[in-house]
């Protein structure tokens, strides 16, 4: 410490210059997320968005925030930081689209004990990539350097997304009825849930993140587990434009089918799912075998191969499937809406997972 000039903020562990340099580095990434309604420029005290410029007439705003859980620990341990930002965006915007809302803008929070500009820039680039895929603007964020609160290279993330839907088009609808069909959209793998259990399986088996993934040739275990969460926004917006047949959507995250599907059901209804219809990605079978995890625990922890579920009228299911395929999706018929059982869970399973 320079006693003549006194103690500085940098000597206390916070480097303002590094933070400013980071902002300059990420500005091109942020600008690339521009869209109607937002110029995606950094530097102001707050981000701006013009709903009229985005084409909305009588919108309802929908907001969501989320994180990526302990998946971020795998990014830190492998040094692969370029896709964890995509996960962050996906977890937020998928929660908007299930209510019928088009994602409009996004803000992020990055917290660490010591700012590593290259790491932070890689994370923000991933966030910008996710925003571009979702069609929303990255209009601001916060980088917090907090020495003593985080150790080593640890960091954490939070995301905040806002979307809009025209009044009268909110989901879920109130006309869900027995006989409606469930259509599932495939996940890319684990997405961003269950990683505390994943890390326990890795630790118990002495598995190396740098070693080959036993179930996915050509990738390391770390690369495979860090496969980013799918963003379902564009295909679902395409479906909304093509047909008015979607009654409800559910983002399958922590808690699986039995926790997330009832959130969109009216009272008096349940769901019957055929587990044998699922094309379960190999990572889930590997985890179940290596960890000795029962099917019931897999179902309540992971998405098991389905990241999004649509509820549609039986007689309009083919139209929705056609629109989904035109958008590049491969929908799977999972089951149907049934009258709620008098006792027991509202989601019942038939068949078995192919783990």
From Swiss-Prot:
So what does this thing catalyse? 2-formamido-N(1)-(5-O-phospho-beta-D-ribosyl)acetamidine + ATP = 5-amino-1-(5-phospho-beta-D-ribosyl)imidazole + ADP + phosphate + H(+)
Family label: Belongs to the AIR synthase family.
Q: In which pathway does it act?
A: Purine metabolism; IMP biosynthesis via de novo pathway; 5-amino-1-(5-phospho-D-ribosyl)imidazole from N(2)-formyl-N(1)-(5-phospho-D-ribosyl)glycinamide: step 2/2
- NCBIfam families, sorted: purM (TIGR00878)
Tell where it localizes.
Answer: Cytoplasm
EC number assigned by the record: 6.3.3.1
> Native species of this protein?
Beijerinckia indica subsp. indica (strain ATCC 9039 / DSM 1715 / NCIMB 8712)
Molecular function (Gene Ontology), one example = phosphoribosylamine-glycine ligase activity
Provide one Gene Ontology cellular component: cytosol
Coiled coil residues, start to end: none
Q: Carries keyword Ligase? A: yes
Record-given protein name = Phosphoribosylformylglycinamidine cyclo-ligase
Provide the top EC class.
Answer: ligase
GO biological process terms, semicolon-separated: 'de novo' IMP biosynthetic process; adenine biosynthetic process
Tell me yes or no: is Cytoplasm among this UniProt entry's keywords.
yes
Major place of residence: cytoplasm
Q: Which UniProt keywords apply?
A: ATP-binding, Cytoplasm, Ligase, Nucleotide-binding, Purine biosynthesis
